[in-house]
């Protein structure tokens, strides 16, 4: 499917918005979904082995935990809405997730030796991810970065298996 023109560059037409949304959803959004969830499962799996089931309290900065507690309260006040999950890792932004990885890189490096490269990749991904998630139109370079990191992320879970770590969904 050829990329449609960014609808924001033309006179408003709802059909252009629909075309853009379908294209971006099919082209990239699902890859972000997979990529972020693989990273969350990877971090949870490794830190569960290294620090135990309650790794969240031991391995995550207090400010991040406070932000998560605030978000949990917001969700609990609207129980009819979708819930991100029970574990705090589902409530953190990509930037906070990257901070958790950075602080715990000494544990993660045992399984993913190139974790420092991943820290840079995740930081590079934040703006393209937010552009797409906030319903804006990413440039081709950003879409290509999402594609590249999605492909690279496929190699992360086999690293768990190689180290005899079962993937643990938070």
PLM segments and residue spans:
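Amphipathic alpha-helical interface elements
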Residues: 1-170
